[in-house]
């Protein structure tokens, strides 16, 4: 019948541990399929997919340039992001949460450049990502004939001289300060400065805003129309509700799951350990030199975290004793 029965091998995820975490979250959610109303289950699934798309993208932006520098994917995943739980654009926590997102936004250019480096080597070598990273670190000849050929092809497709369009004279002027034989560097610079490069940045910003469900009850990012309030990491009430449902599950020795209660601190630590989202950074290595104001911000954030849990019905003050302040499962698997 002329049907192509050959199937290309499905590529493995670039960040394997992050993909495994997404799979585990979906498995945990499926444990509730007979206990949750269908609309609630679908909403949790939607929120989880958005969360993991956003986290995966943020981690690739952070880790890919490091992987190229080291020549391997086998790096420690030390990505983290402060999340502001106060729902107040001018809170004491907001500047620290904004700074983490600003750091990510400032690295977009380096990330986009890294993707072009990967693409150029894979187009040349037709190899997998691990070999590409090794090649970039150990063997890449920046004056290679392949890069010269691609660069010349781009140049030859430009008009010789045009007052309205980017032409060969403009390209020569743009590359005049490069080493004459650095064809790889020149090619990267041309790609970065092209409409393709600027388009990638705009797409990346729009994609993260969408995946993180910015400014919605399910949000991982928030901002306002004012430049005074740029993007910052947050955990919206619906997202927090979804995470709590997953984190009150504990795996038993026989491999099955049961629901359990968690203290406020245990829940905050679980969110940090599992997703890299920092609510209380007082014990974080990143903030070992934190001043009094930053420590006060984290204490304020923990109080806001507690209030948000109270608002969504997972937490009731039963005692002043910290040990008795527990997050109790809304749906029990043992029922």
What name fits each language-model region?
Residues 1-190:
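Long, compositionally biased intrinsically disordered regions
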Residues 291-335:
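C-terminal engagement modules used by replication, chromatin/transcription, nuclear envelope/ESCRT
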Residues 241, 265-269, 273, 303, ...:
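Feature representing long, continuous alpha-helical segments
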Residues 257-274, 278-290:
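Short acidic, hydrophobic short linear motifs in intrinsically disordered regions
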Residues 158-245:
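Long, low-complexity, charged/polar intrinsically disordered regions in eukaryotic proteins
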Residues 234, 262, 297-300:
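Residues within HEAT/ARM-like alpha-solenoid scaffolds
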């Amino acid at each position: 019948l002329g049907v192509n029965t050959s199937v290309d091998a499905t590529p493995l995820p670039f960040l394997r541990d992050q993909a495994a975490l997404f799979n585990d979250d979906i498995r945990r959610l499926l444990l509730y399929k007979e206990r949750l109303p269908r609309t609630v289950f679908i909403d949790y699934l939607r929120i989880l997919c958005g969360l993991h798309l956003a986290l995966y993208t943020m981690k690739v932006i952070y880790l890919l340039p490091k992987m190229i520098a080291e020549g391997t994917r086998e790096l420690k995943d030390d990505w983290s992001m402060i999340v502001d739980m106060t729902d107040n654009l001018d809170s004491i926590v907001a500047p620290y949460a904004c700074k983490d997102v600003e750091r990510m936004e400032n690295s977009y250019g380096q990330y986009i450049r890294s993707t072009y480096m990967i693409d150029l080597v894979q187009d040349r070598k037709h190899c997998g990502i691990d070999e590409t990273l090794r090649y970039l670190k150990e063997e890449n000849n920046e004056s290679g004939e392949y890069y010269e050929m691609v660069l010349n092809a781009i140049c030859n497709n430009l008009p010789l001289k045009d007052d309205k369009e980017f032409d060969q004279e403009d390209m020569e002027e743009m590359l005049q300060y490069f080493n004459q034989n650095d064809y790889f560097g020149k090619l990267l610079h041309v790609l970065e400065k092209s409409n393709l490069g600027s388009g990638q940045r705009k797409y990346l910003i729009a994609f993260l805003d969408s995946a993180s469900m910015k400014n919605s009850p399910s949000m991982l990012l928030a901002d306002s129309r004012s430049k005074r309030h740029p993007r910052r990491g947050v955990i919206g009430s619906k997202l927090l509700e979804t995470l709590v449902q997953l984190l009150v599950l504990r795996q038993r020795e026989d491999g099955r799951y049961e629901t359990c209660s968690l203290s406020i601190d245990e829940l905050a630590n679980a969110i940090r350990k599992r997703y890299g989202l920092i609510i209380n950074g007082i014990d974080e290595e990143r903030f070992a030199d934190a001043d009094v104001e930053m420590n006060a911000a984290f204490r304020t954030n923990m109080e806001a975290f507690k209030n948000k849990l109270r608002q969504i019905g997972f937490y009731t003050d039963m005692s002043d004793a910290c040990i008795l302040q527990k997050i109790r499962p809304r749906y029990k698997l043992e029922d």
